[in-house]
Design a protein with these regions (language model features):
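Class I Rossmann-like S-adenosyl-L-methionine
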Residues: 1-225
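SAM-dependent Rossmann-like transferase core, predominantly class I methyltransferases
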Residues: 220-245
Length: 245
């Protein structure tokens, strides 16, 4: 199984069955169905697509002609999000590969929509530099929500606590780290974040504590062999999802 197909299947289970993303990715990584070099890409695709969901939906909606985007089958929307994430946020993935793999997934899981998915993704390739977001002066909540993919409720809370400029700086910092680090959520039922960090320090594993989540830690590189992950002492979960729990 490829990282893209595994990511698609996980995203569907998360949406349909309400599975927690950290538990879903943990089960998939433990199953051993992915080659070792695909594990990191799989994790990035799942969490990246979830983390950028609001932005991806905002961008994809006007590109869909005929059937309104919200009325598309869930399977089609997930394929579009997964592919659009690669086109917009994964610089090392060639656009042609993102489009072709998205169409191939659609042929396998929703064959009737393959031509539409192909058209939408190719249009996104052509128009991605012309994407227009809401004006921050006119509607700061809508701008922050769609540009940074944060719920309107959290945007209102952040704005009331720190103001627009500081809110932007914070969200920029969080998003900048998302593609560099793998974010883990410490299982505080078993140990504290401080205890978890001490374990990493003893083995010389570099890490950073998350800025907003009190239970998160960021690590560089492939974490699939991390002892603590295998022991259930932590889960892969992006910081935005940790805040939503």
């Amino acid at each position: 199984m490829t990282a893209r197909e595994a990511a698609y299947r996980s995203l569907i289970r998360i949406e349909k069955e309400g599975r927690y993303s950290n538990l879903e990715t943990d089960v998939t990584l433990r199953a051993g169905e992915l080659p070792e070099n695909e594990g990191r890409l799989y994790t990035r695709l799942v969490y990246g697509t979830i983390e950028r969901k609001l932005t991806l939906d905002y961008i994809l909606a006007p590109l869909c002609v005929g059937i309104p985007y919200p009325k598309l089958d869930l399977e089609v929307r997930v394929i579009l999000r997964l592919s659009a994430y690669q086109l917009l946020y994964a610089d090392r993935i060639p656009s042609s590969a993102a489009v072709n793999e998205g169409v191939n997934l659609c042929k396998r899981y929703r064959k009737s929509a393959a031509s539409m998915v192909n058209a939408v993704l190719r249009r996104l390739c052509r128009e991605k530099k012309q994407i227009v977001f809401p004006e921050p002066e006119a509607d700061p909540v809508l701008y922050l929500s769609t540009f940074y993919s944060v719920s309107p409720e959290l945007c209102r809370l952040f704005l009331s606590d720190m103001g627009f400029a500081e809110c932007v700086r914070m969200l920029e910092a969080v998003n900048a780290q998302a593609g560099v680090f793998t974010t883990l959520r410490v299982n505080t039922l078993k140990l504290s974040r401080e205890e978890f960090c001490k374990r990493l320090e003893k083995r010389g594993i570099p890490f950073e504590k998350t800025v907003l989540s009190p239970t998160g830690v960021r690590l560089k590189g492939n974490v699939t062999r991390l002892e603590e992950l295998k022991e259930g002492l932590c889960f892969v979960q992006d910081e935005a999802s940790q805040l939503a729990v």
